[in-house]
UniProtKB/Swiss-Prot annotation:
InterPro entries: AAA+_ATPase (IPR003593), AAA_lid_4 (IPR041445), DNA_helicase_Holl-junc_RuvB (IPR004605), P-loop_NTPase (IPR027417), RuvB-like_N (IPR008824), RuvB_C (IPR008823), WH-like_DNA-bd_sf (IPR036388), WH_DNA-bd_sf (IPR036390). GO terms for biological process: DNA recombination; DNA repair. The lineage of its organism: Bacteria, Bacillati, Chloroflexota, Chloroflexia, Chloroflexales. It is found in: Cytoplasm. Has 3 domains, the large (RuvB-L) and small ATPase (RuvB-S) domains and the C-terminal head (RuvB-H) domain. The head domain binds DNA, while the ATPase domains jointly bind ATP, ADP or are empty depending on the state of the subunit in the translocation cycle. During a single DNA translocation step the structure of each domain remains the same, but their relative positions change. This is Holliday junction branch migration complex subunit RuvB. Residues 184-254 are annotated as: Small ATPAse domain (RuvB-S). The keyword DNA repair applies. GO terms for cellular component: cytoplasm; Holliday junction resolvase complex. Keywords: ATP-binding, Cytoplasm, DNA damage, DNA recombination, DNA repair, DNA-binding, Hydrolase, Nucleotide-binding. DNA binds at residues 312, 317. ATP binds at residues 22-23, 64, 67-69, 130-132, 173, 183, 220. It holds the Pfam family RuvB_C. The gene is ruvB. Residues 1-183 are annotated as: Large ATPase domain (RuvB-L). It comes from Roseiflexus castenholzii (strain DSM 13941 / HLO8).
Length: 347
């Protein structure tokens, strides 16, 4: 269900096709993430000055914030090729070996969802990242021997939404680690105006800011909302996205002024109505919503935590006073006994 939401940060097929035309190609075009961009600018200049590949780089943060786009920008700035893959796509050590042996000098290997690499594949990746060498086994049984192949110097750029799931040995092999934060409304406004120009959409500043304010701090969502509002303006209006058109379109999409949709409100109401405001365990909450645990952790929670609507505790999730106020539900202070009782739901 979460992937069908207009405010999901996960990329659908339409997003993947459209995003290619909207992605920035250079750091100068990249909007937001100023600290990360400046750190990468220095790293790129230093690497090019020494004639070396970029340090292995890890990008982490909620989905939809531009990790893949930033990897492409790094390749363009370094003037090298980039090969794209993902943790789940590398099923066997042979898959990784094929990728590594096809890399040219200074190329970038981008691994999305790198936390989903299995341990056997990580063992192959370690010497490749450290020594630019690939250890392969030749033969079987007692006569098997290890053969080391030299690889050209290259850069691994890893992306993950779940930094804590990376093993320490893998995490330690990245010389450059950067967290991508949610975007400000001002930054998202700039993204809307830029995307509107590329898509040939007429959008007033007021309309653009309204879309930006409801995009949950996420560029992928702001671009998706822009396309949905564009459709509404084309069919219902004169094709121009004004403030009123944006508000009407977003109201029909059930995206409120903070960027919450009906699924977010349903999650908060479940905690409040079914579990007395919490604490409630993650697996129990997921079961009550017929959702996957990963979807709640990766898709729902980051923005609700950012808004201060949700609190994580050792005993489970708690809806905050702000969540009650947003839903128009009277807030009742939880007693210690109630918290202890609800704590039994923690898993």
């Amino acid at each position: 269900m979460s992937d069908e939401r207009v405010v999901t940060p996960r990329a659908g097929e339409e997003d993947q096709q459209i995003e290619k035309s909207l992605r920035p190609r250079r750091l100068a075009e990249f909007i937001g993430q100023e600290k990360v961009v400046e750190q990468l600018r220095i790293a790129i200049a230093a690497a090019k000055g020494r004639g070396e590949p970029l340090d292995h780089t890890l990008l982490y943060g909620p989905p939809g914030l531009g990790k893949t786009s930033l990897a492409g920008v790094l390749a363009n700035e370094m003037e090298v090729n980039i090969k794209l893959t993902s943790g789940p796509a590398i099923e066997r050590a042979g898959d990784l070996a094929a990728l590594l042996t096809n890399l040219q000098k200074d190329d970038i290997l981008f691994i999305d969802e790198i936390h989903r690499l299995n341990r056997a594949i990580e063992e192959v990746l370690y010497p490749a990242m450290e020594d630019f060498a690939l250890d392969i086994m030749v033969g079987k049984g007692p006569g098997a021997r290890s053969l080391r192949l030299k690889l050209p110097r290259f850069t691994v750029v890893g992306a993950t939404t779940r930094l804590a799931l990376l093993t320490s040995p893998l995490r330690d092999r990245f010389g450059s680690v950067h967290r991508l934060e949610f975007y400000s409304v001002d930054a998202l406004y700039e993204i809307v105006m830029r995307s509107a120009r590329i898509l040939g959409v007429v959008c007033t500043p007021e309309g653009a800011r309204e879309i930006a304010a409801r995009a949950r701090g996420t560029p992928r969502i702001v671009n998706r909302l822009l396309r949905r509002v564009r459709d509404y303006a084309q069919v219902i209006g004169d094709g121009i996205i004004t403030l009123d058109v944006a508000r009407d379109a977003l109201a029909k999409l059930e995206v409120d002024h903070l960027g919450l949709d009906e699924n977010d409100r349903r999650l908060l109401r479940a905690i409040i109505d079914l579990f007395g405001g919490g604490p409630v365990g993650l697996s129990t909450l997921a079961a009550s919503l017929a959702e996957e645990v990963d979807a709640i952790e990766d898709v729902y929670e980051p923005f609700l935590l950012q808004l201060g609507f949700l609190q994580r505790t050792p005993r489970g999730r708690i809806a905050t006073r702000r969540a009650y106020e947003h839903l128009g539900v009277p807030y009742v202070e939880r007693s210690v006994d109630n918290g202890a009782e609800q704590g039994r739901l923690w898993t």
